[in-house]
Amino acid sequence: MRRRPRRRRILPYLLGALALVLALSFGVRALRYRLAHENLPGSGIAAPDFVTVDYLPANEYSRPGTPLEEISGVVIHYVGNPGTSAAANRSFFANLALTHETYASAHFLVGLDGEILQCVPLTEIAYCSNTATDYTVSIEVCHGDETGEFSETTMESLEALVAWLCETFSLDPAEDVIRHYDVTGKVCPKYYVENEDAWLSFKQDVSARIEEDKTANGEAS
């Protein structure tokens, strides 16, 4: 009968040891992640104020944690679900960890009201651009109807985001900003595939914004 208290005294030690093991395991994983991502092009770069950072949980289907070792382009997509919000599309990506439906994500989502969500760090790949996944930043853009055309509010935010990425990673909008279509031939983003002039105009607008930013910052063009 007197042995039971001893067992009760041992239990806290066992629980403490288990907690220590778990803490050490978490610390080792965190250290491995930091070492794998600390010298990448996107490391140490904070999102601009107009971007809301809301990372997906780490998982095999939408945020595998694979290092993005090169950033030499930006790929524009459209979500393909008319009327859906940036938050709804982020939820779809996050839920893939449970549904295992497909592999999909994007670094950024631009919404119908111009909101921008960052879903994946710039030190990691996003499952979005097929063979270009390993060296590009991907942007999914929401649209109001089947035409795939983006609203003026959405466009304003998209231009600002792409200009910031080009400035940050020394990219040329004319050459380094591409459509999903340019990678695989998929009709994405639909409006810009079916309206080439609008696509070229968008890239020119991004270039113009970059020049405006340089002028505002007192930099030579």
Predicted regions and their residues:
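Cell-envelope and extracellular/periplasmic
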Residues: 80, 132, 137-146
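Basic/polar, cationic surfaces and motifs that engage anionic cell-wall
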Residues: 2, 12, 16, 29-52, ...
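Glycine/serine-rich loop-strand microenvironments at binding/catalytic pocket rims
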Residues: 116-137, 203-214
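N-terminal catalytic cores of peptidoglycan-degrading enzymes
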Residues: 1-129, 221
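Soluble periplasmic/extracytoplasmic beta-strand elements of cell-envelope proteins
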Residues: 75, 109, 138-140, 178
